[in-house]
Amino acid sequence: MSVLIRPLAIGDVTAAVNVIIGGSTKPEAEQPDETALYWAAAEETRNRRGEVLVAELDDEVVGICQVLIFQHFQHTGGWCCEIESVHVRADKRSQGIGAALLESAEALAIERGCYRVQLTSNSVRRDAHRFYSAHGYTASHQGFKKFFTS
């Protein structure tokens, strides 16, 4: 098995969104037919020095993560990386694909001069927490979110 980690292409959007739906705690929030909106988010991420990465296996998109790069107001305005939307298709988990995505995201953060990488994971995703811990992440902070209704 050889997984390829590469930037998202416009033709990957629907498959990538379906990977997210398969692992999401709120799949109803996703609309895979809204390709233009997802592509705009990917372009905005790139415009801000980040990237949306996909994992490709046997010509199929089986994983995704979004790498956000921003200048932090702490650490003398140092660059920071936030990894979001890490998902691997359920039938492809525990095969090193998530690790390859994480490694590529971290390499991009280092290349862009980031002093730190951070991520959040839903509190109910215990397997994901074990995965991140096994890859050197520590549960050092507690995160909070507030959703707005439209």
Q: What are these regions, as identified by a protein language model?
A:
Residues 118-128, 145-147:
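Conserved beta-strand-loop-alpha-helix junction that forms the acyl-donor binding cleft
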Residues 3, 60-64, 81:
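Glycine-rich phosphate/pyrophosphate-binding loop shared by adenosine-nucleotide-utilizing enzymes
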Residues 72-83, 93, 140:
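A conserved beta-turn-beta hairpin within the catalytic core of GNAT-like acetyltransferases
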Residues 4-18, 29:
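A short beta-loop-alpha structural element at the N-terminal edge
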Residues 102, 109-121:
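Conserved GNAT acetyl-CoA-binding A-motif
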